[in-house]
Regions:
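Short catalytic micro-motifs in class I SAM-dependent methyltransferases
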Residues: 206-213, 235, 258
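C-terminal beta-strand of the catalytic ATP-binding
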Residues: 337-340
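Conserved N-terminal segment of class I S-adenosyl-L-methionine
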Residues: 3-206, 215-219, 284-285, 300-310, ...
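Rossmann-like adenosine-cofactor binding region
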Residues: 189, 210, 219-223, 236-239
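A short glycine-rich, Lys/Arg-flanked "PGG" loop and its adjoining helix->strand segment in the class I
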Residues: 216-231
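Short, glycine-/aromatic-enriched active-site segment of Class I SAM-dependent methyltransferases
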Residues: 232-261, 266-272, 295-299
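Serine-dependent acyl-ester chemistry module
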Residues: 290-294
Length: 340
């Protein structure tokens, strides 16, 4: 039934282009700063070898990018940074680095309104539809990592339920408070059950999971804040998605030190089940895979995709993108789960 909900947002997203939400000059500058920051903040960092964050198997080294090594799990195909710099290095990076500040200010503000129209408005409609189908009444929506509060604003337009934001960054938390939202100014891992009401809850998180130093620790902490049948809806990047598979180490989505974990429709279920969640639905509603390949075609080695991009018209490309999304092979993945 979630497929029906995805169709609701189809008209909003069909013509979405990567350049609209990630203007090339701004995104390239962000990647340039991030590459410099990998040296400044991580060159001398202690690193720890880890097992696959989904199934616990021993990963196989796949490639190195900007002095970060990525392993791929041979069992579940999760792609992840290994060995992994210690948490203190990431805390320092996200607090002080030029690329983090550029993302939170210049990049985000430059694209805020187009993202509102192209991403957050249809996403709010989609989330609201999922909640309705789950038949949750008198509940709270809790946005983990709410940023500038744009998603929360769009949700408030279409629901009477409370929207609460968990946002650890002081300047972003203040922005959200000034918009009238209740804000819990903490990392999720530091949130206590006394910070929350006893109402049923729908937690949401967008494009956060791939950044987590320990996804399992995050999920265990989240589970401890939930009541049975509370739901968690989140989006992340899929290691088996088309553009990531084709571009691999040259994928702009594989961007250390930000993106550490790339789960997929198979492996995300594994980590959810072992942390106390029931996976209700996994979909890949992404709309940018083909466009991302188009924008990075000089890095494509596969002969089929080179010829496809050179010879296909826009209508053909849209048909392929729809097929990729509908069959679970987009790199943008959305998960609906609930506490057991």
């Amino acid at each position: 039934f979630f497929f029906i909900l995805l169709l609701i947002t189809q008209d909003f997203l069909n013509n979405l282009k990567e350049s609209e939400i990630r203007p090339k000059n701004i995104f390239d500058e962000f990647l340039r700063l991030a590459k410099l920051d990998t040296e400044t903040y991580f060159a001398n960092s202690n690193r720890e070898k880890i097992m696959c964050p989904a199934c616990g198997a021993v990963g196989k080294h796949s490639f190195q990018k900007d002095n970060f090594d990525y392993s791929e799990c041979p069992k579940c195909r999760t792609l992840y940074v290994n060995p992994r710099p210690i948490m203190d290095s990431f805390t320092n990076y996200y607090t002080n680095s030029p690329s983090s500040k550029f993302w939170a200010t210049t990049f985000y503000l430059e694209t805020a309104e187009v993202r509102r129209k192209k991403i957050w408005q249809p996403k709010a409609q989609l989330i609201n539809g999922i909640i309705d189908m789950q038949v949750i009444e008198n509940f709270q929506i809790i946005d983990i990592g709410g940023g500038y509060g744009i998603f929360a604003e769009e949700m408030q337009k279409i629901t009477d339920q409370d929207v609460i934001i968990i946002e650890p960054a002081p300047h972003l938390a203040e922005v959200c408070r000034n918009k009238g939202f209740k804000v819990i100014e903490k990392f999720l891992e530091n949130v206590s059950i006394i910070d929350l009401s006893k109402k049923p809850k729908c937690f949401v998180s967008f494009e956060l999971f791939e950044h987590l130093h320990s996804p399992e620790y995050f999920l265990v902490n989240l589970n401890s804040l939930m009541q049975p049948n509370d739901i968690f809806i989140f989006t992340t990047l899929s290691s088996t998605g088309l553009d990531i598979q084709v571009l691999w180490e040259n994928s702009p989505s594989v961007s250390p030190p930000h993106h550490l974990n790339f789960f997929n429709p198979v492996s995300i279920k594994i980590i959810l089940e072992k942390t106390g969640f029931e996976c209700v639905e996994v979909t890949t509603p992404g709309k940018l895979d083909i466009d991302i390949l188009e924008n990075n075609k000089n890095d494509i080695k596969d002969q089929f995709w080179k010829i496809f991009l050179e010879t296909s018209n826009e209508k053909c490309k849209q048909k392929w993108q729809s097929m990729i999304s509908d069959t679970g092979w987009s790199s943008h993945i959305m998960i609906v789960c609930k506490k057991v």
